[in-house]
Amino acid sequence: GLEETYCSMRIKENI
């Protein structure tokens, strides 16, 4: 849910 979206956003920013 919310955690999955947050993790995805973090990974995208890292790249």
From Swiss-Prot:
Protein keywords: Disulfide bond, Seed storage protein, Storage protein
Keyword Disulfide bond: yes
Gene Ontology molecular-function annotations: nutrient reservoir activity
Keyword Disulfide bond part of the UniProt annotation: yes
Function: Seed storage protein.
Family: Belongs to the 11S seed storage protein (globulins) family.
Subunit description: Hexamer; each subunit is composed of an acidic and a basic chain derived from a single precursor and linked by a disulfide bond.
Protein name: Globulin 2
Naturally occurring in which organism (per UniProt): Elaeis guineensis var. tenera
